[in-house]
Amino acid sequence: MLTRSSGVLMHITSLPNAFGIGSFGQSAYEFVDFLVETKQTYWQILPLTTTSYGDSPYQSFSAIAGNTHLIDFDLLTQMDLLKEADYALVNFGDDPTNVDYERVFYVRRTILEIAVKNFLANQAFQADFKNFEKNNQLWLDDFAEFMAIKEYFGNQALQKWDDKKAVARDPKTLEKYRTMLADQIQYFKVTQYFFFKQWTELKNYANQKGIQIIGDMPIYVAADSVEVWTKPELFQLDEERNPLFVAGVPADQFSATGQLWGNPLYAWEEHKKQGYAWWIHRIEESFKIYDVLRIDHFKGFSDYWQVDGKAEVAKDGSWQPGPGYDLFKAVKEQLGDLPIIAEDLGNIDDKARKLLTDCNYPGMKILQFGFEDVSGESLDSPHYCIPHSIVYTGTHDNDVTNGWYNSLTEQQQQYINDYTHRYEDESICQAMIRQLFATVSNTAIATMQDVLDLPASSRMNVPSTIGGNWQWRMQQSDLTQDKKDFLEKMTTLYQRANQEK
């Protein structure tokens, strides 16, 4: 990310298809072709890990296992694991512009069970599957067992399982469930094989076309996760694996009362004793599926916001010291220099800035934040961008540009129009993308919603809210030739065109 470049932020779930949720199928390959056509370098996505309650990719049952909602049925059909009749008439949802997660959860399971049954009955796949099991044994068995037992208890959270011996991982109890739930455990292993096979093939296609994938790693894991189940010593928990303290942030740009995330906090002293082995493994696994890695909430590594585990809001918390450079020094010693982006938004102080400097990771700039301050003093303003940074119009947590602009005061709108020298026939999305690509930041990322000039209804997430998020889906008809032409023109004009292809 040392040369001028650009890309588009678009999560897999937002891709168009007939299966209720975006997948690794034809539309994903067509999206890569669109990026190539418009001379982009990066496709940025949200975490690919499993989603849980609230459908957030930042609250996962596993820090490593993939989201099987993204498995493409047509690709399974090409492997002779499904027939089109198995899914052609299924109702995946009534609104093609939004994901119906509850419906997707139930109907996809039935179809995937057919594919798994056919897969296990076909000897031709078994050698490759055994290699997959062997190469992923550090996490795959635990994940499959966790999910099978969780399902057995009605998908209740780990802490609410009826069998406390299972929660505590009593060896005899676990052996009982391994025998009783053998078929279900195998289902979760095979669907992970499907996920990683399809994603690897898509990523290889993108890389061959000169497109790199920017992935995303949440700083925390969910309380209801395989990590909390198998490695409780790495978290601040009570004897029943309930979080003693939970994560969040105080009041910021996104919420006046702060954000209560609810994730268990790390027992950093224990991580240090173990040489940060869990983190090194997690980051190593991330770079097997991404080319560049954005680490969410980088501030939390210098100081993290600690809230009582029973609190209802995040504002009554306190800052506690994180591991600092000690963690990233250990990562560098084991894995070398890595292309990492630090999400350094929010309450960034001198200590966090020093950590960013010590790590030499590029930080982020958000033009929406910069333009909200009509004094021009915001460090997110275009004139304060620096080459060693990634600049965005907004992220998945921001409103899309149309919605954001319409929420501003007349003074703020006039400031933006004056600053960008907005043309009379130019949409606000075009003006913002033009300004974005003109900055000195080495990498500029536009959201797909802004590329498509979409309204506020296409917003991906409203922080500190539950329900109604992560649902937006693009329609193929949204991507018209004039939208492609504009993106390519801005990319070329501001010297960001991909030189690889």
Residue spans for each PLM region:
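Domain-scale activation on soluble regions of proteins
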Residues: 37, 165-168, 173, 472, ...
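Alpha-amylase-like alpha-glycosidases and glucanotransferases acting on alpha-linked glucans and related
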Residues: 2, 11, 17, 55-192, ...
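Conserved, well-ordered alpha-helix/loop/beta-strand core segments that scaffold catalytic motifs
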Residues: 188-221
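Surface-exposed amphipathic alpha-helices with a cationic face
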Residues: 36, 199-207, 332, 356-357
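Asp/Glu-centered strand-loop micro-motifs enriched in Gly/Pro and often flanked by an aromatic residue
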Residues: 1-4, 9-37, 191
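Catalytic domains of carbohydrate-active enzymes, especially glycoside hydrolases
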Residues: 26-51, 289-290
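Outer-envelope exported proteins of Gram-negative bacteria
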Residues: 46, 212-214, 218, 292, ...
